[in-house]
């Protein structure tokens, strides 16, 4: 079994940036589980499904689904979905479909297969509690809503997306509510997770804190 690091937290808490850079520094693999949820949500939406579709129909649609996560890009049945999942709409779709047990069950199995026997940094919303409950190190990143809105707004603007600060705030509030109140695998820190508030921390400071924890765990 490899050394597994779980990084959870709400949208725009810094998970993706920290997880990617941490994996690079350690020479570990990296898995963004949110990208797998967004890809599957867009895939299902493209085929006319909604979160209110019959569970059996969704299950049949997922049965032969093959997901590959290679160098930060997500492929479904060989088709690159990476660009399709960058919009705010894809994030909302992911939160809606992620409430369905049939979707989570299917993706958790795939995510565990990807992580099996690897030194890996995995980011998401239920990694430490559901996907990798035995991870060697569990981190839960959090930040104020104001800080997260600013980060998400900059991210969208960098991609050339025209969104207002108010729209981003509404999106994050909605996603927070859906993620924390869903019946299946709600967003919450694992009991043994280290909680880090990144509101006033730089990326480098967060990385240094986690790297110190990694070294401590590896030496025990």
Swiss-Prot record:
Keyword tags: ATP-binding, Cytoplasm, Kinase, Nucleotide-binding, Transferase
- Summarize where ATP binds, as residue positions: 9-17
Family per similarity comment: Belongs to the cytidylate kinase family. Type 1 subfamily.
Q: Tell me, what is an example of a GO biological process annotation in this record?
A: pyrimidine nucleotide metabolic process
Which NCBIfam families does this entry report, sorted A to Z?
Answer: cmk
Query: Native species of this protein?
Result: Thermotoga petrophila (strain ATCC BAA-488 / DSM 13995 / JCM 10881 / RKU-1)
Where is the protein found, in the record's own terms? Cytoplasm
One of this protein's Pfam families, by short name? Cytidylate_kin
> Its domain of life?
Bacteria
Q: Name one GO cellular component term.
A: cytosol
PANTHER family associated with the record? CYTIDYLATE KINASE (PTHR21299:SF2), CYTIDYLATE KINASE/PANTOATE-BETA-ALANINE LIGASE (PTHR21299)
Could you identify this protein by its name?
Answer: Cytidylate kinase
Q: What is its EC number?
A: 2.7.4.25
The molecular function terms of the Gene Ontology recorded here are:
ATP binding; CMP kinase activity; dCMP kinase activity
Q: Can you state which reaction this protein catalyses? A: CMP + ATP = CDP + ADP; dCMP + ATP = dCDP + ADP
Record carries keyword ATP-binding:
yes
In terms of SUPFAM superfamilies, this protein maps to: P-loop containing nucleoside triphosphate hydrolases
